[in-house]
Swiss-Prot record:
Protochlorophyllide reductase is composed of three subunits; ChlL, ChlN and ChlB. Forms a heterotetramer of two ChlB and two ChlN subunits. The lineage of its organism: Eukaryota, Viridiplantae, Chlorophyta, Ulvophyceae, Oltmannsiellopsidales. CDD domains: Pchlide_reductase_N (cd01979). This is Light-independent protochlorophyllide reductase subunit N. Its EC number is 1.3.7.7.
Length: 572
């Protein structure tokens, strides 16, 4: 990956700002074979080379050149936002798909935050030395901290099928049970287990039956598009272990876990004698009892939220819904003995945009009802998220109650926006470019546009349009309300092409992964690590300030450098 990144940046100039006129007049795409002369808009472009792929890429480049010119005119203030410069190609959201490399973390990094979120659990990563080195670097802890995760290193004998996988995994799980006594063991499959076709599911069933410890298998390997999809895989596996009723949940808690019996005493079994006669004597006649017993109770609409966030964020979102009269019946993930009940009467709603597999498992396997809502990132997204849940789960269908909820949320959102005014002044009319890393790009771009920023391009490794339909609709609505051109969404972006587009657009901030951050900074491009948005608390009204704190940090850094007389961080 290192050589690929360096070769990608060879064509990048050392200082972008030193030769803007040359860059704007003549831009050479060596990879695509496209030479772009200084011609006016809507003119034909000469394509050097053969093949339909080059013609298609040349057409995309022409449309992108028009789009970039319109954005620059709007940004300079020559033409007001939302005027006739809104090109025909950008009236609707434009989706493009490239075949770029995925310079991102491995999805097994989900162990870093899930082992803390699922209490009394133990994560066993089954992979090679490379996986172990990655976990040591990405999840380094103190020696005496005793983390609840480990690495099962595959050797040559395992890959060549000379060793018995069942005996080795049973030995490791028996040692984990003896040392840590977990309530559940989660096996994390890697690329190697996929390539050699290890049957982890059947092995887990056999070992679970012998050790009496639940074993969940999640194939969070590096064959996915983004590292955040590791959490999606683990949650989709946990969906199958959730009970279908409260009785089955009690039975699951009675199962032996870690060699110790967890007894649950049912308080309803110890009723005093004559209890039923006392209840009957308090009623006027027996006919009323028969009528009441014949009426079927209205099924309660249960709400389960899925997505891994810190406990403080869970409390904040739960309280926000409680203010509107909505009770949260469970969270996924949670402690194994406290997994929520999932059946056809349960409504589920996600809080992260990278949980499409979990949403599919909830609907198809457990017959739950998915609430399609924008994600609670930023004041605008949090308000729409709560409004959609209240609209679906509000038992009182009167328009007065819904209008009151919308009024309260609107006042709350306006109050939050006023508290963020100091950050909004910094980011207003700043341009941002997303290279794509963690699948949070659509939600973050929508929030930044609402803050007054201009988003040139949203690169995203993978996107499920059905799962993010509400978020995409809100993004389009936000652009119309803010009178800014709609950004282009590029799925699986090619890094070389992105470098050329960054050279054309010259954005103020580039949100990128760790692989490209330092090389771009060395070329004079202000960057922001997308990984920071993954691990920061960005959900809900209260955490909107943290999102703006992250995106304005490079802006404030550049302002401080200007005050000190420095023009860049790199020595000329």
């Amino acid at each position: 990956m290192r050589n690929t990144v360096l070769n990608t940046l060879n064509a990048f100039p050392t200082q972008l700002g030193s030769n803007k006129s040359t860059l704007s007049s003549k831009i050479f795409h060596s990879y695509l074979g496209v030479l772009r002369p200084p011609t006016p808009l809507n003119t034909s472009m000469e394509v050097l080379g053969e093949g339909a792929h080059q013609n298609r890429e040349a057409k995309r480049s022409s449309l992108r050149f028009e789009f970039c010119s319109a954005l620059k005119e709007c940004q300079k203030g020559k033409v007001p936002f939302g005027s006739s410069l809104r090109l025909e190609a950008a009236e609707n959201l434009t989706f493009e798909c490239e075949t770029g490399n995925y310079h991102t973390f491995c999805p097994i990094s989900c162990v870093r935050w899930l082992y803390q979120q699922i209490a009394d659990s133990f994560f066993l990563v089954i992979g090679t030395k490379t996986c172990g080195y990655f976990l040591q670097n990405a999840m380094g802890v103190m020696i005496f901290a005793e983390p609840r995760y480990a690495m099962a290193e595959l050797e040559e004998g395992d890959i060549a099928a000379q060793l018995n996988d069942y005996k080795e995994l049973k030995r490791l799980c028996l040692q984990i049970k003896h040392d840590r006594n977990p309530s559940v063991i989660v096996w994390i499959g890697t690329c190697t287990t996929e390539i050699i076709k290890m049957d982890l599911e059947n092995l887990a069933k056999l070992i679970e039956a012998e050790l009496k410890v639940p074993i969940v298998v999640a194939r969070a390997n590096g064959l996915d598009y983004a590292f955040t999809q590791g959490e999606d895989t683990v949650l989709a596996s946990l969906v199958n272990r959730c009970p279908s009723s409260h009785e089955s949940s009690l039975d699951s808690m009675k199962l032996p876990s870690g060699g110790r019996e967890k007894q649950i005493n049912d308080v309803n079994t110890s009723k005093p004698e004559g209890y039923l006669s006392e209840v009957i004597s308090l009623t006027s006649n027996g006919d009323d009892i028969n009528k009441k017993s014949c009426t079927k109770p209205v099924p309660k609409k249960s709400l389960v939220l899925f997505g891994s966030v810190p406990n403080s964020v869970q409390t904040q979102l739960t309280l926000e819904l409680a203010k509107q009269g909505i009770n949260v019946d469970g969270w996924l993930p949670s402690r194994y003995s406290e997994l929520p009940v999932l059946n056809k009467d349960v409504y589920v709603c996600g809080i992260n945009p990278f949980l499409s597999r979990t949403a599919t498992s909830l609907m198809r396997r457990r017959k739950c009802h998915l609430i399609s809502a924008p994600f609670p990132i930023g004041p605008d997204g949090t308000r729409r998220w709560i409004e959609k849940i209240c609209t679906v789960l509000n038992t009182d269908k009167s328009s007065t109650s819904l209008e009151e909820v919308q009024k309260n949320l609107q006042q709350r959102e306006e109050k939050v926006w006023k508290s963020l005014q100091s950050y909004l002044d910094l980011v207003k009319k700043k341009s941002v470019f997303f290279m794509g890393d963690n699948l949070l790009e659509i939600s973050l771009a929508r929030f930044f546009i609402r803050c007054g920023m201009i988003v040139y391009e949203i690169g995203i490794p993978y996107m499920d349009r059905r799962y993010q339909a509400a978020e995409l609709a809100l993004l389009e609505q936000t652009c119309l309300e803010m009178n800014v051109p709609l950004p282009r969404i590029v799925e699986k972006p090619d890094n070389y092409n992105q470098i050329q587009r960054i050279r054309e657009l010259q954005p103020d901030i580039v949100v990128t992964g760790l692989a490209h951050s330092n090389p771009l900074e060395a070329r004079g491009v202000t960057t922001k690590w997308s990984t920071e948005f993954t691990f920061a608390q960005i959900h809900g009204f209260a955490n909107s300030r943290d999102v703006l704190e992250l995106i304005t940090r490079p802006v404030r850094r550049n302002q401080n450098l200007d005050a000190l007389g420095f023009t860049s961080l790199v020595k000329n």
